[in-house]
Amino acid sequence: MTNEKCRVLVHEDLGSGYRRIVFDAPAIAAASAPGQFVHVRVPGLEMSALRRPFSIFNAEDGKLELLYKRVGRGTAVLNELAVGAEASVLGPLGHGFPEACDGVPLLVGGGYGVAPFYFLSRRLMAAGHKPVLFVGGRTSTDLLALDRFASLDVEVRTATNDGSAGTKGLVTDPLDKMLAELRTRGERFELFACGPDPMLKAVAMRATGTGAKGWISMDRHMVCGVGACYACIQKTVRGNSRCCIEGPVFAAEDLVW
């Protein structure tokens, strides 16, 4: 874990309130793994003891890339951070996704829950795997970074509630179709998920119900980010766990819903 003063290299609008920011962060980028997160303190909030947590979208060549949505005071201030400005970034933090996979990696993201899967896809592909990404949202503008996954040649299947892109319905609809295809062919698979709780529970149930491994990134309100305050508790079969230390990624079989 490093507290690094990082300069903004890129900060751009993705539409519908979503943004992409890239920091020059050589120490953090070198130590980061898929599924981990960073805590950012932005100019204008220096009087606050609290940082804001963000999933790592990518870490490569000394650069740290994040996706976020403007939803509160912290992200509103971050939204105004110009190229060339600096912010204090603490990380990498948390327990991420495993990068070894027994079978076909099926990545399931809801909205900006897709954030950790670009980095994970890169690592899985480097290990010889061919991940399949399932992305869901209310409408087509909630499907983020599809061009980036296309640049990796990742197979992407989409779903939207309003039918404006991909399958009309839930992201678990195309997922279920893929699971049926894999079972018919006798192929093994592992599930990886990040997004809203109902989706996470649905994916976890599919993992435990089929005997497959499942890895679930839980989204909980974080305060300190380093395990001291116990604000980000997740119930597991072993008792209460901290999302910032034991998580945010947990084995599906360990979660209590």
Label the predicted regions:
Residues D197-P198, D219-P248:
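Local cysteine-cluster metal-coordination motifs and their immediate loop/turn environment
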Residues I245-W257:
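Short microdomains enriched in Cys/His and/or Lys/Arg
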Residues L45-F54, G94-C101, C244:
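Short, Lys/Arg- and Gly-enriched loop/turn segments at beta-strand edges
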Residues V10, N58, T158-T160, I216, ...:
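Structural signal for conserved beta-strand scaffold positions within catalytic alpha/beta enzyme cores
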Residues R73-I216:
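FNR/FR-type flavoprotein reductase catalytic core
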Residues T2-V83:
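Ferredoxin-reductase
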